[in-house]
Amino acid sequence: MDAQPEFEALRHESSSWWHTARRKLLREAVAQAVHGKRDARVMDLGCAAQLDCPQADSVRVLNAHSSLPALAFRQIEGSQNLICTSSEDLGFVSNSFDAIVAGDILQLVPDDRLALRELRRVLKDGGLLCLTVPAYPFLWGEEDEARGHQRRYTATELRRKLNNCGFEISRVSYLVATGFLPSIVARTFKDLFRKSVAPRRISEGGSRLANAAMVSLLDCERHLIRYINLPFGTRVVCWARKPALVAERVTVPAWDRQWSRPPLPQGMTMSQPDLH
């Protein structure tokens, strides 16, 4: 099977306005999370941030995705440390990562609470989770079906789920406010003049001029949300942390269990040390 058409679609999608803006947003979150740290470990879940950065000597990046074609594309584009894994069962030891970024991943997972608990488990104490998800269930459309989405979120719902899964919320904001009203108009128009057609994948690209204009507008929004939370938009972005000093059950190989106390001789207690 020729994978070239699929790779071309992924390459075109990677240069679209939303993917470009999301990439900048997630990279900023990682830069903030690892600032001043040595040998920091970061997971790019969904490979949305493309974090193969110059400071690779101080930041170790793991690119994770559940799709083999997507990982193959990232390998062609030069990404390293690629792994195919599920958001609901990452397969890493607890407390492994200083930061995790997940660009538009949570809405694809059948059990998003299970995925959030798994992300929390592999984060180090105080570690940062930055994620983006599509906003508002009433904006659900053919594109969501074509992309395999399970749901859309409100900021309140996302905040509640993160809190219930043990995260401390730093900030939650809407994003792509400039595209919110056009999305409502388009959604209403499609509802009024719906046709019986199969769902199709809709590109977030468009003309180069429109793409560049949207990138510039979202650059402005990205700088704006440093100071205020936007009240509406077509995406939700959240910064959350795993609370510090939270004990986690860690599975350690038997040969590494140097902390294990050998069993006491029969009849001896902690108050009766062996003096011989």
Where are these regions (language model features)?
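Conserved N-terminal segment of class I S-adenosyl-L-methionine
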Residues: M1-N95, A99-G103, L116, P231-V236, ...
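Short, glycine-/aromatic-enriched active-site segment of Class I SAM-dependent methyltransferases
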Residues: F7-R11, L129-R151, A155-N163
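A short glycine-rich, Lys/Arg-flanked "PGG" loop and its adjoining helix->strand segment in the class I
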Residues: R113-L128
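Conserved S-adenosyl-L-methionine
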Residues: F167-A177
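A C-terminal cap/extension of S-adenosyl-L-methionine-dependent methyltransferases
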Residues: G179-D256, S260
